[in-house]
Amino acid sequence: MKPLPAASFALDAGKHWWERADLGFSNGELCFAGHSVAALASWSDRPVFLYSGERVLANLARLQAALDSAGVSGAVLLAIKANRFPPLLTTLARSGRCGADVCSPNEIKAALSAGFPAEKISFTATSLSDDDIANLARHPRIAVNLDSLSALRRFGERAPGRTIGLRINPEVGVGGSAKLTYSGRKPTKFGIYSEQWPEALAMVRQYGLRVSTLHVHAGCGYLTEQLTSWRAAIDRALSLRPSLPDLTCFNVGGGLGVPHTATWGSLDLRLWAQALHQTFAKTGLSVLVEPGDFIVKDAGLLVLKVNGIEDKGGTRFVSVNGGFNLAPEPVFYDLPCEPVPCRLRVGAERRVTIAGNINEALDLWYEDIMLPPLAEGDSIAFLNAGGYASSMSSNHCLRGDFEEILVPQP
């Protein structure tokens, strides 16, 4: 990870950029969702993920309010690939406030098992196998968005006359990094390209399919400054509407980003809703949005314990009991999980590098960050671990064990 700006953890330093009503220090103790983080994590010697159901529901409510303010009918679908912890999914399903965006047959099972009704599940994926197609054909009440001519042909053969959606590659991309940009100048595997559109329409007619939905997902992690490009991607896809007489819905995908450091901006939901209003208010189309990170990322922490502290070659290394395999985004996508001590010790801050326990040189959580004194056995909470962390984890070096806790209401 790149070095971060120094941040004071002194008790009188005022609020940190990430603090909010349900996350912050109280008398030197980091508290989350009304509980001491150190106390919540103390019952296990393994790495522990903590999730706040209340924060997830609050994020969902904020997004739904923004969607409502846009003056369009629509709904939110949680991208469950971001976090598939069953108690969390069940909480959302029982709330009735959102549906589920899924991208594999096993995610269909997870969504149904959590209690999401089939009518509130939408499937969008790529590189589908014949078995995938057969599975989708067995779920007539689940919405299906197809993203290739091959999938369209095989689905049409298997389920002629079905109502479907088509995922479009708008050739405009947005994202938190180049690796999170799903369309643009460089060809990608996602979506149907403009030069393929005539053939796609021919297949729709051949198999008697009814296209009710257009789908676009241009990338992940976009913030306010990328809204112009995001809207351009939607406009590109919306230009295809005249050739789709049965179109009733537009799925704008997910990708809504959250800040990871003090220097990052946030996504202005007012401007996001304004863009939706300007694009869709007069179209008569309903709008679906499929966020993952925006709903769950800042509702989760990963708590790791300090194994050792040692000076090597002029660098103070703080080793912890979990590595990048538990939360790959900091290494893969340069999306940091900022470390915060769970209890503040008195003393001067030191510049440290936090290292994981995986036998890979890149397994560094943070390099050259100023932190207050730490000791072996202390706990460190890594922020923004609620999305694409446990769900992307691996058992590399056979160190994939962890616990997950849905934090109870205080």
Where are these regions (language model features)?
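Charged (often Lys/Glu-rich) extended helix/loop segments that serve as interaction or gating elements
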Residues: 275-277, 282-410
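Electropositive phosphate-/nucleotide-binding environments in soluble metabolic enzymes
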Residues: 34, 50-57, 82, 86, ...
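Active-site beta-loop-alpha junctions enriched in small/polar residues
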Residues: 79-85, 103-106, 126-128, 147-151, ...
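Short acidic, glycine/serine/threonine-rich loops at helix termini
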Residues: 88-90, 112-114, 133-135, 155-158, ...
